[in-house]
Amino acid sequence: MQKYEKLEKIGEGTYGTVFKAKNRETHEIVALKRVRLDDDDEGVPSSALREICLLKELKHKNIVRLHDVLHSDKKLTLVFEFCDQDLKKYFDSCNGDLDPEIVKSLLFQLLKGLGFCHSRNVLHRDLKPQNLLINRNGELKLADFGLARAFGIPVRCYSAEVVTLWYRPPDVLFGAKLYSTSIDMWSAGCIFAELANAGRPLFPGNDVDDQLKRIFRLLGTPTEEQWPAMTKLPDYKPYPMYPATTSLVNVVPKLNATGRDLLQNLLKCNPVQRISAEEALQHPYFSDFCPP
């Protein structure tokens, strides 16, 4: 740990405390994530270490770089590239108004990062505005990629903050255990709507039941034909047959027609029907977009 000088505590993440620090040799600013390990645990599980070391190979401009893994008997510290703020803080600073071109650019970068990881069979599983980081050049980077697989998706942060369900798809809310890349695509859809509404969450549920009701009230309760596997999920229970909202115009008023179409393709209750990151990047919504 002598290699890094701690500057200040940034906050409590899902897995532990995060510090801003400086590399004593290069003077580079980094983020140190001290992963909390259970006291009764035998130190760091080897499976977690294997997963984490794989993440060092994820090199992409829209993924937060994992520079280093510092491991002692009871402590695991992950050294990440430093970014100035997360998307949640960014929303707070834009006062309820976000330019449609910025929305498009941020979604494009989110999908680029997702596409890269998905092509390497790495899922995020816990995407939300708090782990989308933005640096001072306006570049968006996905943080905490793959940590959910290494450490499990926690039910609550150890700081007692409940891990949000707002970005979880219906299949996961119904107890699906076999995840595919579609879990991240649903979350991307929720974040897209939140971008379009300058920070207003699409489905701010209070618990699993409320979360599913909010989803079905907007998208319609799926029928057996629309989603045959739904009734087989471990925690499935029937919901009232809500009709789908005829148009998303009132839901995302600032989003144009092609944007609404892309959103509808991301927010499919049946995971099999959800668009992939690669397909989303080819969507007409981006036809007039020139990446910087």
From Swiss-Prot:
Membrane topology, record value: Peripheral membrane protein
Record-listed E.C. numbers: 2.7.11.1
Keyword hit for Cytoplasm: yes
Major localization listed first in the record, in broad terms: cytoplasm
Entry's Gene Ontology cellular component terms: axon; cell junction; cyclin-dependent protein kinase holoenzyme complex; cytoplasm; cytosol; dendrite; filopodium; glutamatergic synapse
Residues of the active site: D126 (proton acceptor)
Protein name: Cyclin-dependent kinase 5
Source organism: Rattus norvegicus
Tissue specificity: Expressed in hippocampal neuronal synaptic termini (at protein level). Expressed predominantly in post-mitotic neurons of the central and peripheral nervous system.
Record field: catalytic activity: L-seryl-[protein] + ATP = O-phospho-L-seryl-[protein] + ADP + H(+); L-threonyl-[protein] + ATP = O-phospho-L-threonyl-[protein] + ADP + H(+)
Residues annotated for ATP binding in this entry: I10, G11, E12, G13, T14, Y15, G16, T17, V18, K33
Modified residue annotations for Phosphoserine: S72, S159
Similarity comment: Belongs to the protein kinase superfamily. CMGC Ser/Thr protein kinase family. CDC2/CDKX subfamily.
Organism domain of life: Eukaryota
